[in-house]
Amino acid sequence: MPDLARLRAKRLFLLDLDGTLYLDERLFDGAADFLRAIRSRGGTYRFLTNNSSRGAESYVEKLRRLGVETEISDFLTSVDALVAHLRAQGMAEKLLYVCGTQSMKRQLTQAGLRLTDDRDAAVDALVMGFDTELTFQKLEDACILLNRGADYLATNPDWVCPTWYGFVPDCGSVCEMLFRATGRRPYVIGKPRPDMVRLAMARGGFSAEETVLLGDRLYTDIACGVNAGIDTVLVLSGETKEADLAGSAVQPTFVLGSVADYLSILQECKKRPHERSFFAPISPAAAGAVRRAAPHRWSARAVKSQR
């Protein structure tokens, strides 16, 4: 059973956004302090999001509006992963029909990719994103292109996107609808594929042991970390509830109620001058945060061994 020293020793924190740090326009309690604590300890965080409906600049604007100072370089999106994949597969010159927002199309065009809205053009591939501007015409065009044999890619497999009033269909739900109509399934680019994790580690020079991924979804966030070979933290502030763990083939390394619980653990740490890792005693308050959130992940030995 993992001990809490592993959580405190991390240097690269890969963070989901929706359901992990905020919900719509509400920043979760402790989120801003958690990010500040990471940097004050000399750590690095990167935001990984499957949401292709907006560019990194809009996330920067949103987080600043919510009280978090950040930069475009702090983000890696499923659109970034899509561009990298197309280039790696020699598809950078292919003609794409994109079912996505104008923001997504603008990002792809700025990356030098060729796009068309004409289903009768010589389309090489259909790309499905989280399209908040989706129309029936786009769905019809997608079916026609898939029936013609166009290559088929999707930015993410998420079934739903959380909002303040509940959930709305995400890219995965639309892809399932297209499957029912055409029998075609896409090659999925974003989480749970490990590409964004590996890219973030490579850019920062971090090892797998130094890296942790935090997210609220088992089948995308946590599976992504597992596929990349890094520790994962499931937070119960978004889509996944603790009851969902029993029936899941994907299991996180740790389960916490929210990022505020991780903050409680970090706040107990004092770095020894000669150490990169943190091994300060954990208080009953911080221990309780983990125990309450994940009794089946809790080990009293992990605390006793640090006293």
Report residues per predicted region.
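Asp-based, Mg2+/Mn2+-dependent phosphohydrolase catalytic module
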Residues: M1-L15, L23-R41, S52-L76, V83-H274, ...
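N-terminal phosphate-binding loop and flanking beta/alpha elements of the actin-like ATPase fold
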Residues: T44
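Intrinsically disordered, low-complexity repeat segments enriched in small/polar residues
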Residues: P273-H274, A280-P281, A285, R307
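Short, intrinsically disordered C-terminal tails of secreted or membrane-associated proteins
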Residues: H296-Q306
